[in-house]
Each structure stands twice: as C-alpha cells, then as structure tokens.
C-alpha cells in the first residue's frame, strides 16, 4: 500500500483516509524501507498534506499507541508541532504547570529536543520532574497532581521505524503534525500550536474528526507555534462542532508587545531557570507569554469565560505562589514513583 500511496502522491493526487491509514500502518509496522519512508515523507511535504490524509495517518498511530490506563473527562493537552526554528524557552510546558495549579487536568504529551536545544522532556528533567514514568505511574501522578507527562517514545514505540529517515531528511514532515494529534490519554481538550497559520483550519478539522471536543489551534505571526506577545496571534477555535477563526493582540490582555529575542531560550538548564524565574514572579517577556498561553488553557478548560480573564487568573496563580507549589508537588510525587520502582 505504501508504494501505491507514493505513486498517487507523485501524480499529484490526494490519498483517501483509508489508503493513508494503511500506508502509515506499513511504516509503523516496520514493513517499509528507509528509502521508501524518506521518499514518502518528502513527496507528501511537496504535495501538501490534506485533512483526510492526516486523519488516516493519526488513526494508524493511535491504533498502535500504548494504552493509557484511565479516562478522565476534560483532560487537556498542550503540545505544539515544533519545527518553528525559534529556539524559545519551553512556553507550553510552563503554561501547563500554571493551568494545573488551578485544577485543570493536563496530560502533557512530549519528547526530547528534535529541532531545538530543549524539548519538554528535557526541561522537565532539568526542573527535577522525572519524565519516564510507566503509564500506571503517570496516571497516578495525574490523579494526585492534575499533571502528568506522557513521554512520546514510550507510548509510540512504532515511531522508531521512521526515526532514521526523519533525522536524515532534517525537514518538517507530517510527523511534526502527528505528535500533537496522537495524545495517548485521548485528551478531549487541546491547545495546539502550529508553525504556519495556513494550517489552522485543516488542523482544527482534523481534531474534530478525531473526537476532540474543544481546541484552540494557534500560530504566531512571528512563526511561533504558540500564542505570541511579539505581534498578532492567529487562532482556530473548535467548539460545539464548529470552527471559528480570529486574531488577537497582546495589548488586548494588558500585556506588552516584546521583541522575539526576549523569548529566546537555551539548553534545558537555561530554560528551566527562565521558567523557575517566571514562577518566582519575575516580570518581562517570558512571564507575559506564559500568562497568555496559560490564560488560553484556562479558557479552553472552562475555568474562565475568556482568555482575558484567564490571563488575570494565571497572574494570580503565579503571584500567589500556587504555581511554584504545584511544580514542587509534581516533582515530589513523580520523583517518589521513580524511587519506588
């Protein structure tokens, strides 16, 4: 099926959902050669991935993912595509901790660095939070703290077959989109950042087809796969089965506009220090972008009625010490599970 799919793509034809699912299944099952995988990913990128294709690919990955042992209503994921080349600090990871401090249940799906110096797994480890919990321990951590980390290589072991070709291609591929679309815990609510605003309506449509109830798919005008404080943020909001697109500016939420360089991070330890400083009350660009994205999560999870009130609440959580206490709680619970195993 992969050979057939590749032939169709080279003819400029779009794949059906079924063909896409079967083709990705062959890759996930180790039935494709590295050359076939590389050609498939590169030609697909050149053609442009369509909604039905992405749905099929995501279904193939979800079918092969390790099972997460519990289902919780209102579960949120904050996971971006990466690949934006911005080298910012780990904004969505920091924002997830803020939202968890207000009682939002978050199953953060992520990995180590691919295109940056520090992935979500790297910075959490630098903050003292173990990331390689078993599914049972991760579920227990979620129950106890409202936050757990789902380490992608553990849950998506079939992805190893595509790892080599992806690394050698060294370009964005459909797998950048698929990571955020395949949360092992089946999160029903999602803040998903993408690297190109043109992807927003299609990705929102895919999330709807994958039974996500509410989503904010976002892209910064500066290329960030986050809500940004350097300029305009583009949003596709999925709610009640409908998709609404709109734009926001940082000034709408009482936030200053900053230069992109002020958001730049470094390695995991440098990014951990930035996050620790934000949680300790430091003012500036890092705080403002965390407030904006955490406020969006609180709105997404129906903790507040608007992103604006979410930003205000996020500031209260940080300044009241609740976010730092949440980080310490997660560190204690997850660390205890590692030592006990």
Curated annotation (Swiss-Prot):
Q: Which residues form a coiled coil?
A: none
Could you say which residues bind anthranilate 2 here? 166
Give GO MF terms, alphabetically. Answer: anthranilate phosphoribosyltransferase activity; magnesium ion binding
Q: Tell me which EC number(s) this protein carries.
A: 2.4.2.18
**Swiss-Prot/TrEMBL keywords:** Amino-acid biosynthesis, Aromatic amino acid biosynthesis, Glycosyltransferase, Magnesium, Metal-binding, Transferase, Tryptophan biosynthesis
Q: What cofactors are annotated for this protein?
A: Mg(2+)
Which reaction does this chain catalyze?
Answer: N-(5-phospho-beta-D-ribosyl)anthranilate + diphosphate = 5-phospho-alpha-D-ribose 1-diphosphate + anthranilate
The answer, when asked if Zinc is one of the entry's keywords, is: no
Q: In which pathway does it act?
A: Amino-acid biosynthesis; L-tryptophan biosynthesis; L-tryptophan from chorismate: step 2/5
Tell me which InterPro entries the record gives: Anthranilate_Pribosyl_Tfrase, Glycosyl_Trfase_fam3, Glycosyl_Trfase_fam3_N_dom, Glycosyl_Trfase_fam3_N_dom_sf, Nuc_phospho_transferase
Q: Name one GO biological process term.
A: L-tryptophan biosynthetic process
Return the GO cellular component terms, semicolon-separated. Answer: cytosol
**Which positions in this protein are listed as binding 5-phospho-alpha-D-ribose 1-diphosphate?**
80, 83-84, 88, 90-93, 108-116, 120
One Pfam family it belongs to: Glycos_trans_3N
SUPFAM superfamilies named in the record: Nucleoside phosphorylase/phosphoribosyltransferase catalytic domain, Nucleoside phosphorylase/phosphoribosyltransferase N-terminal domain
Q: Subunit details for this protein?
A: Homodimer.
**Member of which family?**
Belongs to the anthranilate phosphoribosyltransferase family.
Question: What NCBIfam families would the database entry show?
Answer: trpD (TIGR01245)
Name of this protein: Anthranilate phosphoribosyltransferase
Q: What is the lineage of its organism?
A: Bacteria, Bacillati, Bacillota, Bacilli, Bacillales
